[in-house]
């Protein structure tokens, strides 16, 4: 008899920190800069990557110290999860909070990020370095459901 995976047997609140962190598929979509319209508060998504994002691997270069390097970096927690409506529809945190399952390409199911990159879920195919961008408004995207 096989053991039920933790994401099916526990609520987000019941997960350990290690389990919580492992839900992140590493797509890098959280690490793309967003712009907010000052009049409407509407959020616009760009393909401009945070300076700390390694675009090839879609990993933070300084994850443990990211807030020192990027004070505006977000920390997704169990408490603030409901406030991040902009999370991608493929995000495990969002899906589990909505009572849905993980997508078939998720690294917890496949054992690697290969399928996620192959499905073009990650930002590696669309992200540009912040240092190479002059006008962020030229890099506004629709919500990156599929990068």
Swiss-Prot record:
Signal peptide (UniProt feature, chain positions): none
Protein origin, superkingdom: Bacteria
Name recorded for this polypeptide: UPF0260 protein Ent638_2368
Similarity section: Belongs to the UPF0260 family.
Taxonomic lineage: Bacteria, Pseudomonadati, Pseudomonadota, Gammaproteobacteria, Enterobacterales
InterPro entries found in the cross-reference section: Puta_zinc/iron-chelating_dom, UCP006173
Organism: Enterobacter sp. (strain 638)
């Amino acid at each position: 008899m096989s053991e039920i995976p933790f994401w099916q047997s526990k609520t987000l609140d019941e997960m350990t920190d290690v389990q919580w962190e492992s839900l992140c598929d590493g797509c890098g979509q959280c690490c793309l800069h967003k712009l907010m319209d000052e009049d409407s508060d509407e959020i616009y998504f760009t393909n401009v990557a945070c300076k700390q994002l390694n675009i090839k691997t879609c990993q933070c270069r300084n994850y443990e110290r990211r807030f020192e390097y990027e004070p505006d970096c977000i920390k997704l927690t169990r408490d603030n999860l409901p406030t991040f409506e902009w999370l991608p529809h493929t995000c495990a945190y969002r899906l589990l909070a909505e009572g849905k399952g993980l997508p078939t390409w998720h690294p917890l199911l496949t054992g690697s990020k290969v399928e996620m990159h192959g499905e073009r879920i990650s930002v590696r195919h669309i992200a540009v370095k912040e240092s190479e961008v002059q006008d962020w408004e030229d890099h506004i995207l629709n919500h990156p459901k599929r990068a």
